[in-house]
């Protein structure tokens, strides 16, 4: 009942050296790369999201949830077993085929990039996405967040984590060099590594605002060492709706330098998102 496949518009005019999932050739190369990556990890049925599950359930009230970048869909299964109407999307096809073929068959999860989420608008009151956005090319970030906004209900919450460093598969030393040699596609694994303030500016431009209380709750319940460890730069607790206070401003934890924890922002985020919305309207009417 939630599924509504959107009209797909493919942009084939991609600048040289600028990879994007909306380019059909690049899309197939990315899917191949991540399937090969899954094989390198011996098809491990891991759940990166599960460490956050208790914190999410304690903090947020939700009946419907989308896990964007659900991997092998372990968290989706756990949530459904607890009565939540949880769904998932995953750009790589192999993890779902190996570990979630039943969920693929019944339309609970889909193998699709975040730019083309096959669910109706305003379907979910909770969004999760753990260690996914750094894998998305920068040219596709705004389209991805725009799709999350489309399927999220007004007032929905989101918990998103974004990697803040170069992937070990983007280096070439020792064991890593051997692993990289087995991957035929030479795109980066971590395409978009940006400072915390850049992400806050980007989310805010799309109407997602930081919830500092929820963020600290997640740090306390899900960060190894809890509040005794520095708050992670790449964790974001967000609410879709009207801003409260200064939700786009990065708050620096005690003992940390703003240049390290927050970094440089994205001053043109609102302008870039406004252009995207204009382009999407043109595509829809074409």
Which stretches of residues belong to each language-model region?
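Conserved beta-strand signature within the Rossmann-like core of class I S-adenosyl-L-methionine
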Residues: 155-163
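A short acidic, helix-capping loop that chelates divalent metal ions and anchors anionic groups
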Residues: 168-170, 182-183
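Active-site-proximal loop/turn and secondary-structure-junction residues that shape catalytic pockets
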Residues: 132, 164
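Short beta-strand-to-coil "C-cap" segments at the C-terminal boundary of structured domains/repeats
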Residues: 238-243
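Conserved N-terminal segment of class I S-adenosyl-L-methionine
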Residues: 1-120, 126-130, 139-145, 174-178, ...
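A short glycine-rich, Lys/Arg-flanked "PGG" loop and its adjoining helix->strand segment in the class I
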Residues: 142-156
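A structural motif corresponding to the C-terminal end of an alpha-helix
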Residues: 202, 206-209
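A short His-aromatic
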Residues: 135-136
